[in-house]
Curated annotation (Swiss-Prot):
Its main location: secreted. Residues 21-26 form a propeptide. It is found in: Secreted. Hemolymph (at protein level). Peptide which plays a role in the humoral immune response to a subset of filamentous fungi, including F.oxysporum and F.verticillioides. Residues 1-20 form the signal peptide. This is Daisho1. The modification Threonine amide is found at T41. Disruption phenotype: Adult males infected with spores from F.oxysporum or F.verticillioides display reduced survival.
Length: 42
């Protein structure tokens, strides 16, 4: 069950990021820290 909760959380996070950020380009890196997640392209 923990796995499914983690997967659902990741899906929700990616959905929120997709709404807040432009479409990620190839080579995009998802940076995750204790308090923030953000996308860095490069």
């Amino acid at each position: 069950m923990k796995f499914f909760q983690a997967a659902a959380l990741l899906l929700a996070m990616f959905a929120a990021l997709a709404n807040a950020e432009p479409v990620p380009q190839p080579g995009t890196v998802l940076i995750q820290t204790d308090n923030t997640q953000y996308i860095r392209t490069g």
